[in-house]
Amino acid sequence: MKVKLINFRQVGLKYECFALKMLQDRDFNDEKQFKNELEQLKRFNGLVHDHLVTLLATFTLDKRYYFLFPYADSTLEQYWESVKSPKRDLSTAQWVSKQCSGIMAAIDSIHDPKHLQNLGVRGYGRHGDIKPDNILWFQSSKDPRGILVVSDMGLSSFNRDTSRSNIPNTKIPKVPGYRPPECDIEGGTISRAYDIWTLGCLFLELLTWWLGGWELVEKFQEARKSVYITGAINNIFFHLKKVKGRNEYVAQVKTQVTNVSSRKLFQVS
């Protein structure tokens, strides 16, 4: 959708294209999903923090639900793939550090929304789906390297103080990839710590890209692949290990993850 060039508040971004998101039948219950995502986008957006995506408009057409957003140049994973060999210099290190800090601050504004508390609304949010596909890269007039923005509030939630840490894991979709151990442990509960785990996974892959480019990211993703207790192959960051002599399992971070964390696995100098 091409339109006249406009200026927007969010960190000096300029848009001449927009992204239109349509909820598909697979997106749970369309109306329920639409209302939840709309409420979260009203609470948490680029007007609250520069590293959160901004909802521009919503509408329904032929019983389908639509969201209108600024058009991103790429997702974070697409950015990694396009910039295959980033420079390992001070300037790039500062940019990576700045983006990590900005993403952390954006998530903190969801976890501890002081802008809502100042309005008398008491509660705590959780994003619930942090992954490279949901981190968008935008060009910016304020930074020649662009800016990373957290998007997709479809799985996010907002809870009152009393319920912020006791949501049963049976009530959330079991997303692959970055999901934390509490998703798979019987009786596990979901809290804001869910986002902290997924942030750690994201930042580890981001640093892997900076240290070794897209090739190293692919190697790391491949190295994490293992057979899960269900028999399926996945590349999540942990595995479940049966406790000897007992009918229960404990979660452990995969050796491949701790190795790359200490730069052993691929001998990055």
State where each predicted segment sits.
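Short beta-strand micro-motifs within the conserved protein kinase catalytic domain, predominantly
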Residues: 54-65, 73
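Activation segment/activation loop of eukaryotic-type protein kinase catalytic domains
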Residues: 133-177
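Structural motif at the C-terminus of the N-lobe alphaC helix and the adjacent alphaC-beta4 loop
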Residues: 40-50
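Catalytic-loop of the protein kinase fold
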Residues: 111-139
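ATP-binding glycine-rich loop module of kinase domains
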Residues: 2-35
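Conserved C-lobe activation region of Hanks-type protein kinase-like domains
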Residues: 184-264
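Structural motif in protein kinase domains
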Residues: 71-84
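Activation segment of protein kinase catalytic domains, centered on the conserved DFG
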Residues: 83-102
